[in-house]
Swiss-Prot record:
Pathway: Carbohydrate degradation; glycolysis; pyruvate from D-glyceraldehyde 3-phosphate: step 1/5. Induction: By gibberellin. It comes from the Eukaryota. Phosphorylated after gibberellin treatment. One of its GO terms (molecular function) is NADP binding. It is found in: Cytoplasm. Key enzyme in glycolysis that catalyzes the first step of the pathway by converting D-glyceraldehyde 3-phosphate (G3P) into 3-phospho-D-glyceroyl phosphate. Essential for the maintenance of cellular ATP levels and carbohydrate metabolism. NCBIfam families: GAPDH-I. InterPro entries: GlycerAld/Erythrose_P_DH, GlycerAld_3-P_DH_AS, GlycerAld_3-P_DH_cat, GlycerAld_3-P_DH_NAD(P)-bd, Glyceraldehyde-3-P_DH_1, NAD(P)-bd_dom_sf. The gene is GAPC1. This is Glyceraldehyde-3-phosphate dehydrogenase 1, cytosolic. Plants contain two types of GAPDH: cytosolic forms which participate in glycolysis and chloroplast forms which participate in photosynthesis. All the forms are encoded by distinct genes. Keywords: Cytoplasm, Glycolysis, NAD, Oxidoreductase. Its EC number is 1.2.1.12.
Length: 337
């Protein structure tokens, strides 16, 4: 199989990091980027310098002309087109398009990319109607006739593998999740208008902000056994990257906390290696910046009330881990064709 050729629509936090992952992958080739809101020289600057993930040092990045970037010696076509149905992906050779604008998240809107010659579209956000796949959980349900998929959210990618391991081994009766979540681009630097979410309009760098999240309910879509058994909420906190899930569950099969730890450790070394991590060191959030795993279980941070009621803690780099899964999902889709 030749290299998997991808295009990226929307060069924001996830778009740029997916580009970084692609450029460090031997089996994936980035051939095109579309963003109508930034010029090619600014795109170069934003790609090269990153406050959280550091300066790009893997290859030179240069501007060949207003419509072409050179990454090393490899040309990447740049478009600046607003309407997704007008982007000529086929011209650039892009077969898989990562839809990372955060705008075209339903099937109908994302399907516009197919008109320009894309074969498949991966939405880097939850979708109300596109099938959601979480690597390590339900990607085996993908079939080659599905053209538009969602990679779910970063939080669902952390929660679902952990929930799967617990449910497979001990059976989840019900559970509540809280994610303590780093700031994202939709928040405000200072208090500002946010008519749909009043709390969300408050200054991100100065507040702990309670917020809603569909991540726990979405687990029921990728693990139908857990449909209706999990829900959750979020606290947005003043850190720029790395979030942490607190999953509190009642389990059917009585188990000591040590037995639960052992099941997760075993999964992290076996089938879910690279998806689930396991740590026993006394780590804090910045220790996970740049960690490509979806869900890193913190054995020391969790606690059991009794053999049927337990709180589990898992870290995730909500930017880098998620961006790696976008590429992993594309790899899986390409293999399935």
């Amino acid at each position: 199989m030749g290299k998997i050729k991808i295009g990226i629509n929307g060069f924001g936090r996830i778009g740029r990091l997916v580009a970084r992952v692609a450029l460090q992958s031997e089996d994936v080739e980035l051939v095109a980027v579309n963003d109508p809101f930034i010029t090619t020289d600014y795109m170069t600057y934003m790609f090269k310098y990153d406050t959280v993930h550091g300066q790009w040092k893997h290859s030179d990045i240069k501007i060949k002309d207003s419509k072409t970037l050179l990454l090393g010696e490899k040309p990447v076509t740049v478009f600046g087109i607003r309407n997704p149905d007008e982007i000529p992906w086929a011209e650039a050779g892009a077969e898989y398009v990562v839809e990372s604008t955060g705008v075209f998240t339903d099937k109908e809107k994302a399907a516009a990319h197919l008109k320009g010659g894309a074969k498949k579209v991966v939405i880097s956000a939850p979708s109300k109607d596109a099938p959601m796949f979480v690597c390590g959980v339900n990607e085996d349900k993908y079939t080659s006739d599905i053209d538009i998929v969602s990679n779910a959210s970063c939080t669902t990618n952390c929660l679902a593998p952990l929930a799967k391991v617990i449910h497979d081994n001990f059976g989840i009766i019900e559970g509540l999740m809280t994610t303590v979540h780093a700031i994202t681009a939709t928040q405000k630097t200072v208090d500002g208008p946010s008519s749909k979410d009043w709390r969300g309009g408050r200054a991100a760098s100065f507040n702990i902000i309670p917020s809603s999240t569909g991540a726990a309910k979405a687990v029921g879509k990728v693990l139908p056994d857990l449909n209706g058994k999990l829900t959750g909420m979020s606290f947005r906190v003043p850190t720029v990257d790395v979030s942490v899930v607190d999953l509190t569950v009642r389990i059917e099969k009585a188990a000591s906390y040590d037995a639960i730890k052992s099941a997760i450790k075993s999964a992290s070394e076996g089938k879910l290696k690279g998806i689930i991590g396991y740590v026993e060191e006394d780590l804090v959030s910045t220790d996970f910046v740049g960690d490509s795993r979806s869900s890193i279980f913190d054995a020391k941070a969790g606690i059991a009330l009794n053999d049927n009621f337990v709180k589990l803690v898992a870290w995730y780099d909500n930017e880098w881990g998620y961006s790696n899964r976008v590429i992993d999902l594309i790899r899986h889709m390409a293999k399935t064709q």
